[in-house]
């Protein structure tokens, strides 16, 4: 192979001569532009570049393992503790020569170990064989001896077996009888002891009560004890109260009334044991009859806490959680307060909070999923169809005004960019194009910073990302963001270097800048294809399509064509005549007109389908974008679209999703309100800009809401009172009037009834078609609500030369104005040795015994400081004024 010059090699590598010379210098080879390069020097350069662009020298892997440990605590409760074990391992990349040496050493060591292992196995095999032979001989001898013993013992065993069984049964029976008698004796002694103690205590109580109630002279002491029996049960306490009332009311009628007669109406509130105790309490004194009937407590407190399996759904109230754990609601509230959360008994809490509380109280938690119906509906699908090749879904991404839509226009031979407001894309456009080599579906995403979520949705729904970079502008912020979205979705990237026909185009600069973010061209050893195109001149369009189809062929994209369809919502909006309209990209199956679809919170039957050209179609296969009509509402962009069999079940699932979303949202709102309670109490007055937002499509509503909420500061907050898709209605105008909000319409207009309300209420209605203008005007409105910044500006300095006494003003400072101008009634500071010792107001300013309003630089004057007489020679009087600076939101 002949040597080539530096210039020739630079042309082959499509790089500048200076850069190539610098790369040779970095590799340790000094060359000039006209020098020749040998094959060995080329290889040295390639090795240097590969080493420079190689991966990191050190790789650290971290692993976390979580487990739960039940620890017993005081009170018999057990507490579940979450344990996290963290492991860390670092791999260091070795030098190639060092790696080869270590590999050779390891190989030699493995061979030596293998040789030693084989020798040990052979030795062990020989020993095992010898041992087996010895054991076989011994075994034969033992078996012969044992056979003889068994024959002799068999005869004795048959005769003695029956005698042994009889003896064992008799011994076991005697032992059980002895144990039963012992237990019975102990139980009788314990019961007798308790009855004697109870009887003594009851008699003592009766005597004491009889002495206190001297008016019951005719009653016997034993009858007194029945009236004032120890109140060990609910029935006995009620009987005692009844007896007291009867005695108090019937003192004049007689003393022999039966005082402790229970009422029959109270039997529903007591147990059988309570009624027996009450009867014993009433009749306990008559000859000792039924004295020891049943004074023992029936309920025994558990020795330790009972741990239950608590089943928790996605949301639960505090009261329901307490019932599941069989505790009082106040205990659950106390446990939540210990965890730092305030709650009421009827408050709805989320699953995570309920799980923490239940585990803190020592119970085992079982998390329940409440979407069984949803899973059943989604799993009831056609299966078994074979996968077929499908068209690739390609997303065009890049910075704003880099020519994404214009590039797509040339491919589609239409003029879409001219129809976009301000010439920038503000929706996701979905189109499919037929080429000579096959069909390609394109998604065009907006490049403005506000449409981050739209670009992320585009990357998630795609197979290949075409990254459009202007050759004259290079890599910009949204270009970097598009690269991040593509990497997050693990989608291959094809780079289209646009505007290549401009004289200031520099494609090498684009390659170098993209290489910093991991996008390397194939000629540099990377995986990304770079295609130079011009959307205006049409240069390189065919090469771009070939590159896309080549990448799709490598990916081997397949999908099931027959069966129930599934896909994703790319965009959605509310049409005045057609109702909710959703742009759907079919991923699998075939979507037919009349199918029942479930789409996020919405459902419905497909009444009509149109392609991107507005033509009616009856079906749409994989990778085909269509607009569908017939949904119950406007779905959120990014929702999954699924064809289901039963419309009733689809409606139930949609309603369940709406209810679940609302419950989770309310639980989070309540939690945030309680958490921010003290912050809201301490913060000052905050101005709010209320906005009612209406836009033409769901994606624009989402993007504008995010952008406006990010403008909020500590002093001025943006509050989206209401938002939606479609024109401005009378309801929107009424809401804006009630909340003193600004009405914002993005690519929509107000209807006649709304305009009447707007005129009557003098509402602020603003129309926009470009998102830049909307954000700038809201920012200006917020800036007007900011309090101005106060700044002190020094306007003059005066040096005290002498001090005079005045009967009217006290000490007067004779001064020379050294800088600026001194004005009357301005605030001043008195400085001594460059330290402020007094701050006040200039009360008197005279020149030649005349009052003046100001004295300029270089003139003498007399200054009287208000309420300050400690002016000395050498002090400096600093005169300043306070100016207001209007602040703006950055």
From Swiss-Prot:
Residues 92-217, 267-280 have a biased composition (Basic and acidic residues). Residues 398-405 are annotated as: G1. Residues 252-266 have a biased composition (Basic residues). This is Translation initiation factor IF-2. GO terms for molecular function: GTP binding; GTPase activity; guanosine tetraphosphate binding; translation initiation factor activity. The gene is infB. Belongs to the TRAFAC class translation factor GTPase superfamily. Classic translation factor GTPase family. IF-2 subfamily. Residues 423-427 are annotated as: G2. GTP binds at residues 398-405, 444-448, 498-501. Residues 67-81 have a biased composition (Polar residues). One of the essential components for the initiation of protein synthesis. Protects formylmethionyl-tRNA from spontaneous hydrolysis and promotes its binding to the 30S ribosomal subunits. Also involved in the hydrolysis of GTP during the formation of the 70S ribosomal complex. It comes from Shigella dysenteriae serotype 1 (strain Sd197).
């Amino acid at each position: 192979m002949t040597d080539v010059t530096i210039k020739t090699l630079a042309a082959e590598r499509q790089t500048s001569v200076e850069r190539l010379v610098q790369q040779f210098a970095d590799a340790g080879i000094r060359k000039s532009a006209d020098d020749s390069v040998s094959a060995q020097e080329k290889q040295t350069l390639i090795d240097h570049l590969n080493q420079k662009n190689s991966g990191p020298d050190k790789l650290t892997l971290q692993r976390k393992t979580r487990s739960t440990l039940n620890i017993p605590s005081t009170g018999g409760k057990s507490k579940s503790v979450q344990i996290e074990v963290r492991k860390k391992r670092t791999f260091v990349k070795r030098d190639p020569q060092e790696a080869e040496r270590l590999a050779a050493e390891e190989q030699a060591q493995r061979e030596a170990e293998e040789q030693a292992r084989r020798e040990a196995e052979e030795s062990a095999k020989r020993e095992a064989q010898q041992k087996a032979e010895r054991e076989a001989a011994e075994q034969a001898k033992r078996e012969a001896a044992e056979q003889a013993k068994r024959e002799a013992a068999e005869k004795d065993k048959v005769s003695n077996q029956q005698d042994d069984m009889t003896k064992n049964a008799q011994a076991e029976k005697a032992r059980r009888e002895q144990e039963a008698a012992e237990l019975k004796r102990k139980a009788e002694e314990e019961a007798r002891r308790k009855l004697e103690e109870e009887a003594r205590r009851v008699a003592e109580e009766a005597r004491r009560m009889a002495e206190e109630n001297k008016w019951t002279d005719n009653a016997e002491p034993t009858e007194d004890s029945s009236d004032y029996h120890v109140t060990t049960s609910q029935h006995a306490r009620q009987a005692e109260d009844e007896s007291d009332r009867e005695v108090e009311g019937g003192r004049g009628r007689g003393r022999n009334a039966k005082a402790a007669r229970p009422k029959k109406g109270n039997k529903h509130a007591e147990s059988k044991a309570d009624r027996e105790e009450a009867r014993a309490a009433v009749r306990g004194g008559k000859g000792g009859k039924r004295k020891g009937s049943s004074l023992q407590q029936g309920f025994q407190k558990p020795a330790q806490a009972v741990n239950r399996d608590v089943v928790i759904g996605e949301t639960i109230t505090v009261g329901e959680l307490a019932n599941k754990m069989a505790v009082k609601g106040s205990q659950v509230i106390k446990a939540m307060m210990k965890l730092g959360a305030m709650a009421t008994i009827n408050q709805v809490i989320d699953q995570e909070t309920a799980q923490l509380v239940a585990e803190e109280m020592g119970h085992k938690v079982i998390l329940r999923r409440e979407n069984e119906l949803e899973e059943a509906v989604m799993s009831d699908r056609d299966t078994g169809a074979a996968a077929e090749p499908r068209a690739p879904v390609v997303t065009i991404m890049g910075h704003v005004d880099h020519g994404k839509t214009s590039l797509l226009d040339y491919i589609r031979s239409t003029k879409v960019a001219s129809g976009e407001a301000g010439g920038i894309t503000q929706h996701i456009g979905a189109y499919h194009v037929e080429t000579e080599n096959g069909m390609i579906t394109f998604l065009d995403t907006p490049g403005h910073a506000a449409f981050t979520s739209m670009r992320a949705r585009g990357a998630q729904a795609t197979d290949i990302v075409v990254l459009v970079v202007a050759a004259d502008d290079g890599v910009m912020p949204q270009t970097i963001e598009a690269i991040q979205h593509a990497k997050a979705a693990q989608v291959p990237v094809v780079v289209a270097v646009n505007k290549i026909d401009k004289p200031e185009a520099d494609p090498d600069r684009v390659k170098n800048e993209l290489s910093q973010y991991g996008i390397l061209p194939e000629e540099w050893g990377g995986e990304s294809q770079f295609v130079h195109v011009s959307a205006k001149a049409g240069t390189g369009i065919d090469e771009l399509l070939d590159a896309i189809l080549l990448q799709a062929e490598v990916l081997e994209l397949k999908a099931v064509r027959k069966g129930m369809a599934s896909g994703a919502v790319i965009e959605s909006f509310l049409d005045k005549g057609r109702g909710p309209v959703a742009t759907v990209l079919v991923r699998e199956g075939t979507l037919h007109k009349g199918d029942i679809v479930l789409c996020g919170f919405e459902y419905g039957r497909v009444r009509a389908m149109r392609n991107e050209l507005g033509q009616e179609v009856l079906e749409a296969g994989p990778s085909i974008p269509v607009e569908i009509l017939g949904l119950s509402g406007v779905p959120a962009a990014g929702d999954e679209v699924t064809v289901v069999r039963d419309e009733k079940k689809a409606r139930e699932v949609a309603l369940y999703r709406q209810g679940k979303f609302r419950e989770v949202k309310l639980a989070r709102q309540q939690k945030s309100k309680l958490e921010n309670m003290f912050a809201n109490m301490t913060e000052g007055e905050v101005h709010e800009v209320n906005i009612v937002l209406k836009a033409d499509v769901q994606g624009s509503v989402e993007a504008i809401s995010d952008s406006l909420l990010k403008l909020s500061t500590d002093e001025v907050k943006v509050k989206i009172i209401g938002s939606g898709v479609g024109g401005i209605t009378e309801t929107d105008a009424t809401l804006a009037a009630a909340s003193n909000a600004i009405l914002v319409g993005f690519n929509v207009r107000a209807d006649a009834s709304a305009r009447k309300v707007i005129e009557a209420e003098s509402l602020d209605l603003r129309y926009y078609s470009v998102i830049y203008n909307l954000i700038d005007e809201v920012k200006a409105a917020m800036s007007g609500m900011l309090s101005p910044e106060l700044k002190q500006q020094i306007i003059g300095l005066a040096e005290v030369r002498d001090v005079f006494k005045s009967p009217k003003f006290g000490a007067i400072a004779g001064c020379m104005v050294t800088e600026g101008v001194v004005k009357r009634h301005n605030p001043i500071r008195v400085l001594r040795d460059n330290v402020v010792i007094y701050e006040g107001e200039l009360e008197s300013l005279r020149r030649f015994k005349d009052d003046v309003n100001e004295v300029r630089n270089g003139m003498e004057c007399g200054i009287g400081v208000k309420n300050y007489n400690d002016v000395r020679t050498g002090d400096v009087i600093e005169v300043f004024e306070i100016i207001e600076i209007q602040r703006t939101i950055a």
